[in-house]
């Protein structure tokens, strides 16, 4: 839908260049239970379909590719890597400089106009806390002078929790870890040649090719669940070594009611922050996730996907307690933290 898609911007959005049959199977199975959506970035997100990708000519088009790389040679831009920001220095509550460390050398960078803090949902609140902005009693517990008592800093952490089901399938069409699958190891070099010469083939895949936005309750105005169908087996963010080929499907809670916190562990910026996402602390989140698991498996158990339904972690679909136990044991972040810098 051209009304919802720009045409000339630097960050390119494109259709996938590789047509994986298993992604088609997912969409076909899902469309027997939900409507088909050919453009998730159009006027309506609900339905089952194939995701668009931020690619150009089959290669990743990230924010760095689109915006940073073209600007790197500007005389008024200095990029500092291997740098840790400690805190922002203030004068009468006006940000005037930034204290940081680059390769063990401490620097203070003074602002001529303004300072923009873009450290993300974990970095920004911890920098503010070390700078003296946050909950006064918490700052005092670390012997930090409170410049501004803002109780929302480091609070209200919300994140999308995600559960994955993996299915082992012996197929040439699916991804696997290098040398963990004979089929993929044999096919990968030929696909690499295709990618280098024509920017086509498996290596143009984003892996999470298909998906859906669905409702746990049809009375809802908008979807509260998202599915990602991945043309490879995934466990523990890819850290778990698995032999063979397969596919996975994620179910993600889009509107969690559970909230957590992020706080500094000390005044040392090299110390990892204390992150408590507090997942599933609200009972309604678990209720929706259980419904979401069932809706996901309803698609997995529908042809043409059902013929490949060799689940690595099977659960009794009729047992709420078993589903809840699996969700508590195996769910994890899908990297969408927000909400920790309430001003």
Q: Language-model segments: which ranges?
A:
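Conserved redox-cofactor binding core of oxidoreductases
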Residues: 1-95, 164-188
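FAD-dependent oxidoreductase catalytic-site/capping-region signature
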Residues: 1-42, 49-51, 190-343
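Alpha-helix boundary recognition
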Residues: 31, 69-73, 129, 140, ...
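A short acidic-Thr-Gly-centered motif at the start of a beta-strand
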Residues: 69-73, 108, 343
């Amino acid at each position: 839908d051209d009304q919802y898609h720009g045409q000339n911007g630097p960050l390119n959005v494109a259709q996938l260049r590789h047509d994986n049959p298993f992604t088609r199977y997912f969409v076909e199975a899902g469309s027997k239970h939900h409507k088909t959506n050919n453009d998730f970035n159009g006027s309506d997100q609900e339905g089952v379909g194939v995701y668009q990708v931020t690619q150009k000519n089959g290669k990743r088009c990230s924010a760095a590719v689109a915006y940073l790389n073209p600007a790197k040679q500007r005389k008024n831009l200095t990029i500092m890597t291997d740098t840790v920001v400690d805190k922002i220095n203030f004068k009468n509550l006006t940000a005037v400089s930034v204290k940081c460390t680059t390769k063990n050398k401490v620097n203070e960078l003074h602002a001529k106009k303004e300072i923009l803090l873009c450290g993300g949902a974990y970095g920004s609140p911890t920098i503010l806390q070390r700078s003296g902005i946050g909950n006064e009693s918490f700052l005092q517990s670390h012997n930090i002078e409170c410049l501004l008592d803002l109780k929302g800093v480091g609070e209200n952490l919300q994140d999308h929790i995600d559960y994955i089901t993996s299915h082992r399938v012996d197929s040439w069409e699916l991804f696997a870890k290098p040398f963990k699958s004979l089929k993929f190891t044999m096919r990968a070099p030929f696909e690499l040649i295709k990618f280098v010469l024509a920017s086509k083939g498996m290596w143009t895949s984003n892996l999470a090719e298909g998906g859906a936005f669905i409702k746990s309750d049809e009375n809802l105005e908008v979807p509260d669940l998202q599915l990602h169908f991945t043309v490879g087996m995934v466990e523990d963010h890819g850290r778990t070594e698995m032999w063979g080929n397969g596919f996975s499907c994620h179910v993600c809670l889009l509107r969690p009611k559970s909230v957590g916190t992020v706080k500094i562990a000390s005044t040392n910026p090299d110390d990892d922050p204390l992150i408590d996402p507090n997942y599933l602390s609200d009972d309604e989140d678990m209720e929706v996730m259980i419904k979401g698991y069932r809706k996901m498996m309803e698609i997995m158990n529908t042809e043409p996907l059902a013929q490949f339904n060799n689940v690595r972690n099977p659960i009794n679909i009729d047992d709420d307690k078993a589903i809840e136990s699996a969700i508590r044991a195996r769910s994890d972040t899908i990297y969408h933290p927000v909400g920790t810098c309430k001003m």
